[in-house]
Design a protein with these regions (language model features):
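Short amphipathic alpha-helical segments and helix-helix/interface helices
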Residues: 16-18, 60-67, 132, 187, ...
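Short, well-ordered alpha-helix to beta-strand connector turns
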Residues: 41-44, 70, 140
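Structural motif
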Residues: 4-10, 31-32, 47-51, 76-79, ...
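A glycine-rich, often tryptophan-bearing local segment used as a flexible ligand/cofactor-contacting loop or short
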Residues: 54-125
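Short, flexible loop segments at the rims of nucleotide/cofactor-binding pockets, characterized by
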Residues: 22-27, 49-53, 142-145
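Alpha-helical scaffolding within the catalytic cores
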Residues: 29-34, 58, 149-152
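Catalytic beta-strand/loop cores that center a nucleophilic Ser/Cys/Thr
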Residues: 13-19, 104-179, 183, 198
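Aromatic-Pro/Gly-enriched surface loop or interdomain linker
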Residues: 1-44, 189-200
């Protein structure tokens, strides 16, 4: 079972209205009422983009208990104000226009290419822009790095009993607002990978 956590903001509501992504999740959980849900019912919990920091901090202990119980926690977008332990986030200037510049590029490189996610996601699907980067913990697998060696996407199976998946990418935001075409194949890739993992 996969649960996805939302603020209930307009872009999130538009995302949840998209029929093509309903197979990504089984239940929608509102973060303001997270205490009403039994998180033990879920194998994977997705924290969608741009959730309220005060509520994330309020429920930090529940998220930690969830992942320490051997489950998978996925965090999309910025991880601000040190709300989650082990995550080293640094803001960066956002390059919104590299694709319209002559010879423009947004340098990044796949890592650990044998990870099963790469059966469903290509580099082009992850390349639009980013708001910051992570320093992946020792022993974690970075899947996408920028030239300075920091990560845009990593999988951590060493810091907790479960699996922490963290990416700077914010596909639900862009799908909900109707721009950044790459966000769709990227999120479909995530969904296919999760459903494959669920079936094992």
């Amino acid at each position: 079972m996969i649960g996805i956590v939302t603020n209930g903001l307009p872009f999130q509501n538009r995302f949840f209205a998209e029929e093509e992504f309903k197979y990504l999740y089984d239940d929608i959980l509102h973060i303001r009422e997270l205490h009403r849900y039994d998180l033990a019912n879920y194998d994977t919990l997705i924290l969608s983009c741009r959730l309220d920091i005060p509520h994330l901090k309020r429920y930090q202990s529940q998220f930690l208990s969830f992942i320490e119980s051997g489950k998978r926690l996925i965090i999309f977008g910025e991880v601000l104000d040190n709300w989650f332990p082990t995550i080293d986030w640094v803001d960066s200037e956002v390059n919104f226009s590299w694709w319209v510049q002559d010879g423009g590029d947004l340098p990044m490189e796949e890592q650990n290419k044998t990870h099963p996610l790469f059966k469903y996601v290509a580099l082009r699907d992850m390349k639009w822009h980013y708001h910051g980067s992570f320093l992946a913990p020792d022993g974690a697998q970075s899947l996408l790095d920028i030239p300075d060696g920091r990560s845009l996407f990593y999988v951590d199976n060493v810091s907790f009993n479960g699996e922490l998946v963290v990416t700077t990418l914010d596909p639900m935001f862009h799908i909900g607002l109707g721009f950044i075409d790459q966000s769709r194949p990227f999120l479909h890739g995530i969904a296919k990978w999760l459903r494959e993992e669920e079936g094992q």
